[in-house]
Amino acid sequence: MATTIDVLILMGSDSDAAVMSAAGEALTEFGLTWEMTVASAHRSPARVMRLIDEAPGRGVKVFIVGAGAAAHLAGVVAAHTTMPVIGVPIDSSALKGMDALLSTVQMPPGVPVATVAIGKPGATNAGVLAAQMIALGRPEIAAKLVDYKKKLADKVEAAAERLKNKA
């Protein structure tokens, strides 16, 4: 991946890559640069801090952070940066991701984590949300978002037409 990136995707374990890759796919669709890596709030806190500290010099504008179970990674990142942090709860325990959802969303005032849905749909939405944030200062990304939303609407119209023809 590029040295200068728009978005840094962090995940607590490499087992989260199958979910978090959906965020990267969304970012790529909008022409954004990104990097994905593993950093654990519990097992490698020094690595987490180094990645946060290096981010401004790399051009990072948004963090997308996925973790399961206790899921403290997004909160730790949010506590140490003023950049937007989007949290993706991951289903990795007997609680089916609800523990990760609550750990990610329940942040104290002044330390926000924008939290999306559990799992791959949430990771996709994290990529789209990051693009929307970055688009505030980049008209070419805003234009790609308009096209993306139009494609979503066109799919709904096509589905409605197919159902209408079956009736």
Where are these regions (language model features)?
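Short glycine/serine/threonine-rich phosphate/pyrophosphate-binding segments
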Residues: 16-20, 44-48, 67-76, 95-98, ...
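Short, solvent-exposed amphipathic alpha-helical segments in soluble enzyme
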Residues: 23-29, 53, 80-82, 131-132
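Glycine-rich phosphate-binding loop
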Residues: 51-93
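C-terminal binding/interaction regions
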Residues: 5, 11-18, 22, 98-167
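N-terminal beta-loop-helix "entrance" segment that forms/cooperates
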Residues: 36-57
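Short glycine-rich or small-residue beta-strand-to-loop segments that form or flank ligand, phosphate
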Residues: 6-11, 35-37, 63-65, 86, ...
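Glycine-rich phosphate/diphosphate-binding loop of Rossmann-like nucleotide-binding domains
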Residues: 2-43
